[in-house]
Amino acid sequence: MKLNEIRDNEGATKNRMRVGRGIGSGKGKTAGRGVKGQKARTGVAIKGFEGGQMPLHRRLPKRGFTNPGATDLNEVNIGRIQQAVDAGKLDPSAPVTVEALLAAGIVSRVRDGVKILGVGELSAKLTFQVARASKSAVAAIEKAGGSVTQSLAATDGAVASA
């Protein structure tokens, strides 16, 4: 046996049916599409139309809304801030503000401010001036000898465009 002698087993493949090639072919005239109507025509069917069945986008419940007044805060863990201090990206003597976090590359595209979360360890004594901080983050910061000032006004419109 040679590579050029290899072929499929008898009956393993079937020739494709060529439709619309005369009544003697078995798939002539309407070519298996039935008679007339939208589905007999060429082209794509209507988007979202499911043959009369209630379409998915109408079956699903209408719930909730998008709150236009919601604050979009970037979340940062204290462990990430400690890494930045250890790497020399954050100055421990200066207050930790949105501008400082942006400059250190910890956050990007800040909209309404930054929220500090309490995951990780913090050993540096830092002063935070941020929009929000979780209870666990405040406890960890104060345990390390630091302080937290929370105010949504801590971020002005100039930071949002940065």
Curated annotation (Swiss-Prot):
InterPro entries: Ribosomal_uL15, Ribosomal_uL15/eL18, Ribosomal_uL15/eL18_sf, Ribosomal_uL15_bac-type, Ribosomal_uL15_CS
GO cellular component annotations of the record: cytosolic large ribosomal subunit
Alphabetized GO MF terms: rRNA binding; structural constituent of ribosome
GO biological process, alphabetically ordered: translation
Coiled coil region boundaries: none
Gly residues compositional bias, start-end: 21-35
Pfam families in the record: Ribosomal_L27A
Keyword RNA-binding among UniProt keywords: yes
Organism superkingdom: Bacteria
UniProt keyword terms in alphabetical order: Ribonucleoprotein, Ribosomal protein, RNA-binding, rRNA-binding
Residue ranges, compositional bias (Basic and acidic residues): 1-13
First and last residue of the signal peptide: none
SUPFAM superfamilies: Ribosomal proteins L15p and L18e
Protein's UniProt keywords contain rRNA-binding: yes
PANTHER family given in the database record: 50S RIBOSOMAL PROTEIN L15, LARGE RIBOSOMAL SUBUNIT PROTEIN UL15M
Family: Belongs to the universal ribosomal protein uL15 family.
Subunit structure: Part of the 50S ribosomal subunit.
Descriptive protein name: Large ribosomal subunit protein uL15
Source organism of the structure: Methylobacterium nodulans (strain LMG 21967 / CNCM I-2342 / ORS 2060)
